[in-house]
């Protein structure tokens, strides 16, 4: 496997820490050891997160093309767009963000706080659009890029989650290589890796990276899209493309892509009672915060799978904390009493 041939622009602090979740493990019976890899602490750029790791491989391409404006898209409380805005500010580039109405959640301050507030503070041109949730290529995003061209700028396209970008899976191939180096220091290997999936390139990169040592199907995606068939297809397609890019040496099969669909409800961006319980439990036992859109759902999935006995006794499970906490303030009614 050859990830090193791709240029990488450093935006992160370095390898993200792996933290034992001792109290949560004990609370759940102590038969499974839980750990978290803290991608939410990976950068000084506006709280970082998983997209910052991905953007390290997109930035060299943007610079080589002579782009002057990063153009991205997401929901109103998109973590992706906040991280793109931070990278643009860091590079001295302009930034245009299309923020669609992906979540059926009404709150008078939803579009004024959290991620979107931070993006505005960093100077991004934020454009609110009424279109609903979709993980594919969007006309509103293409129109934003054309508007930059018409104004004499040179846009660089960054799709939702970086996922439809040809280089979008590379960052989390690197994640897997990083975990292997940390496992060598820890003296053990993780039996499972739990990760939230929506647009797909995070899990796709992990699948490719862990396929190198036979653990592709030990990457357990927890769907948060509530459109699991499309998400599974997108993960698989991105993984196959990424495997070719890095010369994995074997094809990615549908069996390599494991996506648990039980925890996405009631729909994208809205938590169910189990997700809210998981968010509060993790916060109160570990002081680790998760959000109701993404990480709360993957935390719910991991906790439930432990309780159901779906991880063998003695298993070591790594939870990939991808970020997302800045969105919590947009759900202030949900968490008004903690």
Curated annotation (Swiss-Prot):
EC class name: hydrolase
Family, similarity comment: Belongs to the ACC deaminase/D-cysteine desulfhydrase family.
Gene this protein is translated from: acdS
Keyword terms of this UniProt record: Hydrolase, Pyridoxal phosphate
Record text on subunit structure and interactions: Homotrimer.
A GO molecular-function annotation: pyridoxal phosphate binding
Source organism, top-level taxon: Bacteria
CDD domains for this protein: ACCD
Catalytic activity, reaction form: 1-aminocyclopropane-1-carboxylate + H2O = 2-oxobutanoate + NH4(+)
EC number: 3.5.99.7
Native species: Burkholderia lata (strain ATCC 17760 / DSM 23089 / LMG 22485 / NCIMB 9086 / R18194 / 383)
Residue positions of the active site: 78 (nucleophile)
The protein's name: 1-aminocyclopropane-1-carboxylate deaminase
Modified-residue entries (N6-(pyridoxal phosphate)lysine), positions: 51
Role noted for this protein: Catalyzes a cyclopropane ring-opening reaction, the irreversible conversion of 1-aminocyclopropane-1-carboxylate (ACC) to ammonia and alpha-ketobutyrate. Allows growth on ACC as a nitrogen source.
InterPro entries with a match to the protein in the record: ACCD_DCysDesulf, ACP_carboxylate_deaminase, ACP_carboxylate_deaminase_bac, TrpB-like_PALP, TrpB-like_PALP_sf
GO biological process, one term: amine catabolic process
Residue ranges of coiled coil: none
Cofactor dependency: pyridoxal 5'-phosphate
């Amino acid at each position: 496997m050859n990830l090193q041939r791709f240029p990488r622009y450093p935006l992160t602090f370095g390898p993200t820490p792996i933290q034992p979740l001792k109290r949560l493990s004990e609370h759940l019976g102590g038969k499974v050891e839980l750990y978290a890899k803290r991608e939410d602490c990976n950068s000084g750029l506006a709280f970082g997160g998983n997209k910052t790791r991905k953007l390290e491989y997109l930035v060299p391409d943007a610079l080589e093309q002579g782009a002057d404006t990063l153009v991205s898209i997401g929901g109103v409380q998109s973590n992706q767009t906040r991280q793109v805005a931070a990278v643009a500010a860091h590079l001295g580039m302009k930034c245009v963000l299309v923020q669609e109405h992906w979540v059926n959640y009404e709150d008078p301050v939803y579009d004024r706080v959290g991620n979107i507030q931070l993006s505005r503070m960093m100077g991004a041109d934020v454009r609110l659009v009424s279109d609903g949730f979709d993980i594919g290529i969007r006309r509103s995003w293409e129109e934003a890029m054309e508007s930059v061209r018409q104004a004499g700028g040179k846009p660089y396209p960054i799709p939702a989650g970086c996922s439809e970008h040809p280089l979008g899976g590379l960052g989390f191939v690197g994640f897997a290589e990083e975990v292997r180096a940390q496992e060598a220091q820890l003296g053990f290997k993780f039996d499972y890796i739990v990760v939230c999936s929506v647009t797909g390139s995070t899990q796709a990169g992990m699948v490719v990276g862990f396929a190198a040592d036979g653990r592709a199907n030990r990457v357990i995606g927890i769907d948060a899209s509530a459109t699991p068939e499309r998400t599974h297809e997108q993960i698989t397609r991105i993984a196959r493309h990424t495997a070719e890019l890095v010369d994995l040496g074997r094809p990615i099969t549908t069996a390599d892509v494991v996506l648990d669909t039980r925890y996405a409800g009631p729909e994208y961006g809205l938590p169910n009672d189990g997700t809210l319980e998981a968010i509060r439990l993790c916060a109160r036992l570990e002081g680790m915060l998760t959000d109701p859109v993404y990480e709360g759902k993957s935390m719910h999935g991991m906790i439930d799978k432990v309780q159901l006995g779906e991880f063998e006794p003695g298993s070591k499970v790594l939870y990939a904390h991808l970020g997302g906490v800045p969105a919590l303030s947009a759900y202030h009614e949900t968490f008004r009493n903690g």
